[in-house]
Structures are given as structure tokens and as C-alpha cells.
A protein has these predicted regions:
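Short linear motifs at protein or domain termini
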Residues: 1-32, 38, 42, 163, ...
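A short, mixed-charge helix-start or loop-turn motif at secondary-structure junctions
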Residues: 14-19, 59-60, 105-112
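Conserved amphipathic alpha-helical segments that form helical-bundle/coiled-coil interaction surfaces
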Residues: 25-105, 122-125, 137-152, 156-159
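Short, highly charged C-terminal tails/helix-capping segments
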Residues: 158-172
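Hydrophobic/aromatic-rich alpha-helical bundle segments in the mid-to-C-terminal region
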Residues: 107-113, 135-139, 160-164
């Protein structure tokens, strides 16, 4: 399709060359998902609200892989409930681009109990606002959620980079180095 060829593929190439582009996509998601949440609060049908709720409940899975997949479905269900095909297709494209690079980060977020708890509370706040038709509340809740995701992913990446630097240091940080220096 046109969007696959002209949007998704070039972004996938950028992501393959430099995974930090995922943060650029996350910034774009702020604008798009805030809008999908706003429109979903105004337009969601009872059936769409039920689908959003079911996707949310699936994010509570103890299996981090299933929970992270359900997280994607949750966000896409909100986009579907916005009744805006451009927003929905854009969201689908973003998740297609991010699928491989962010899957690991999503799984890590779901493995850390305090992070998992905060994600759950944030998702619930988005749902609550959508279900009562509070468009501004839904937009704000989604922006707060994505801000938290952005901060958490950056922290995980920084921790991973710090760990990689430490393991490359020579010296007495591990048993094998001490034995060689003795």
C-alpha cells in the first residue's frame, strides 16, 4: 500500500539504523493519541467501549508478552473508537514500525511491579474519561500516560547503557578481572 511504502518502510529503515528514532515516534504519538482519546470520548459506541475494556483487562496478564501485546490492542481500540480513519491508520503504522524495537521495552515495563501498577492506573484513567465522555480528561490522561512511558523507556535505556559501560571496565568489578591482576 501507499502508506506502507511511503511512511512505514522509511521509518523502519530509520529505526534499524538508529533505535533512538523510537523516541521521535513516541513524541508524534503524543499528538495523535491525545487526539484519538479525545475523539473516542466523544464518539465511542457501547460496543467499542466494551472492546476497550476487554483489551485493558488483557493488559493485566501475568505474562509480560501477552500484556505488552494487549497494550498495543488497547491503544488501537481507542484509535478505532475515535472514528477517524486517518488517526487509526497512522496509529497502525506507528505500531507496525515500533513492534520489534519497542516490544522488549514494553515487556520490561510490565515486568517491574511499580511500573506495571502505574501503567494500569494510567490506562484506567484514560478509560474512565472515555467512558463518561470527558474528552479533555481523556486527552490529558493519555498525554500523562505517554509522558510516563517516554520517561520510563529513557530510564531503562540509560540503565542498560550504564550497565554495558560498567561491564566493559577493566579492574576489580568482577572476579575474573581480579584473578588476572593478582
Amino acid at each position: 500500500t501507499w502508506s506502507e511504502q511511503n511512511i512505514v518502510q522509511p521509518l523502519k529503515t530509520l529505526m534499524a539504523d538508529d533505535p533512538d528514532y523510537s523516541f521521535d515516534i513516541l513524541e508524534a504519538r503524543y499528538a495523535i493519541e491525545a487526539s484519538t482519546a479525545w475523539h473516542a470520548a466523544m464518539r465511542a459506541t457501547p460496543g467499542e467501549k466494551e472492546k476497550i475494556q476487554l483489551c485493558f483487562e488483557a493488559t493485566l496478564s501475568e505474562d509480560p508478552d501477552l500484556a505488552s501485546q494487549a497494550d498495543v490492542r488497547f491503544h488501537l481500540a481507542i484509535a478505532e473508537a475515535s472514528h477517524n480513519i486517518v488517526l487509526l491508520q497512522t496509529m497502525r503504522g506507528f505500531f507496525d514500525v515500533l513492534q520489534s524495537s519497542v516490544k522488549h521495552s514494553r515487556q520490561r515495563m510490565y515486568l517491574v511491579p511499580p511500573v506495571f501498577s502505574q501503567l494500569t492506573e494510567q490506562h484506567q484513567a484514560v478509560i474512565d474519561a472515555i467512558f463518561v465522555g470527558d474528552a479533555d480528561g481523556a486527552r490529558k490522561a493519555m498525554m500523562a500516560h505517554l509522558s510516563f512511558v517516554h520517561t520510563t523507556m529513557k530510564r531503562f535505556d540509560e540503565d542498560q547503557a550504564r550497565h554495558a559501560r560498567i561491564t566493559r571496565l577493566p579492574g576489580d568489578h568482577n572476579e575474573h578481572s581480579r584473578e588476572k591482576n593478582a
